[in-house]
């Protein structure tokens, strides 16, 4: 299947903001086919930087990208020509938005699964579908399903009571990582637990929790794949990520000194998970690498992911273009790197209120870096943008990327 053009229409030159209200029936369709001569409409729920970075790729593919944002100053809403305002958990807003597009996809995983099932029942095309997306939304469901399928995971426990946690602590040797089953991101919703008292506040909330053994990993890897509705898959080089206070800070592509057989296992694992869960779009499989070369799944994301931002400048086909190709059921693109090494460094929350001066300095210092700012207000620890550097020498390429990011957020030209 593919997404041919549909009814005649023209693209707006300025943003159109509409409220999330509609009395029109849902477009009844079991595929992404649209009729006529207009460009296919791809609807992205969420107005963050991931939706923002899909826009250039949508233009190149002649896709009309529509965004459901909560406010006109969100990252994607600031630059999109088709914006509807409404919350991702408001059934009326989401339904109205879905009825205005041909395919629905996501900037984040937080849309209620029941709402997405209702949309599919009405004939809305949702990619990835709720039966797949639930495994990126609910960590307990993810662990249970991946374990059932035989994919490598850390040892884990479902925790709902103090007795459950005491059992997990005893069986793990008294050292656990406790996670909220839903909603955690960038270090939020995660804590180390060595005694029952450490987690009493979380237990009192009455929500199921995921407890995992504390993995003795040597580093974190990410394997990204894209999958079309018919099953075609494209894999990306496996990357290494560095975290700072639970937030992705640096990504190196490909992962340095990764044994070829480990890289192949990681790519095969990601492809198998995409097939087993029937994911459509991008899938990022975050992995732990053990000292002996074993790998285990950490988390899943069914959308473009921070560990794939390097592909915007360092790959023939970026993850953002690839995601749109997949959800629009277009042939997938080449994932060959365009340089020996690509290093991406996030620009995280700054003491500066405006990054423009630092960005100008960074660009002047190194004309070879690529800069991507998200148009977001400055807040401590917040992802405000990223820089990428490409080169033939890994150490020098990483130095350049780190220096540029440091200059942007501090104005200091010295190496971080």
Question: What are the roles of these predicted feature ranges?
Answer:
Residues 155, 175-178, 209-212, 283-284, ...:
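A short linear hydrophobic-aromatic micro-motif
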Residues 264-285, 291, 301-352:
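Active-site "cap" helix and flanking loop/linker of ATP-utilizing ligase/carboxylase catalytic domains
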Residues 1-144, 148, 163, 409-411:
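ATP-binding N-terminal substructure of ATP-dependent carboxylate-amine bond-forming enzymes
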Residues 225-229, 287-291, 375:
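Short, low-complexity Ser/Thr-rich regulatory SLiMs
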Residues 135-222, 226-273, 401, 405:
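Active-site nucleotide/adenylate-binding loops and adjacent lid/helix of ATP-dependent enzymes
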Residues 234-237, 283, 295-299:
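Protein kinase-like catalytic core scaffold
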Residues 12, 16, 25-28, 38, ...:
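Peripheral (often C-terminal) accessory segments that flank ATP-dependent C-N-forming ligase machineries
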